[in-house]
Amino acid sequence: MQKARIRLSGISPKDLDGVCNQVKSIAERTGVNISGPVPLPTKKLVVPTRKSPSGDGTATWDHWEMRVHKRLIDIAADERALRQLMRIQVPKDINIEIVLEG
């Protein structure tokens, strides 16, 4: 039987866990096997910027950071489960990647 690997990523861990819970509830309702969600390492993106607007004065820096959280879910590729997965309401800052593996 085919497997669907679902990779979720986003900057809000609260929204990410909400989508993971929706996927788990779909798997329980349809009765398919599920493994996960597996938390993957968080990627930290750091952008240093100068504090002074003109460039004069001492070189003081601000460091802005964005964290990208990721989750991985493997689910049996049942047709009913995949149709319901396509209808999940997903927040704008969450990215979903679904790959079918044989």
From Swiss-Prot:
Cytoplasm as UniProt keyword: no
Entries under SMART domains matching the protein: Ribosomal_S10 (SM01403)
GO MF terms held by the record: structural constituent of ribosome; tRNA binding
Family annotation (InterPro entries): Ribosomal_uS10, Ribosomal_uS10_CS, Ribosomal_uS10_dom, Ribosomal_uS10_dom_sf, Ribosomal_uS10_euk/arc
GO biological process, one term: translation
Keyword Transmembrane helix in annotation: no
Ranges in a coiled coil: none
Keywords: Ribonucleoprotein, Ribosomal protein
Any one annotated GO CC term: cytosolic small ribosomal subunit
Protein family membership: Belongs to the universal ribosomal protein uS10 family.
Chain's role: Involved in the binding of tRNA to the ribosomes.
Subunit structure as annotated in this protein's UniProt entry: Part of the 30S ribosomal subunit.
Matching PANTHER family: 30S RIBOSOMAL PROTEIN S10 FAMILY MEMBER (PTHR11700)
Name of protein: Small ribosomal subunit protein uS10
Biological source species: Methanosarcina acetivorans (strain ATCC 35395 / DSM 2834 / JCM 12185 / C2A)
Upper taxonomic lineage: Archaea, Methanobacteriati, Methanobacteriota, Stenosarchaea group, Methanomicrobia
Gene behind this protein: rps10
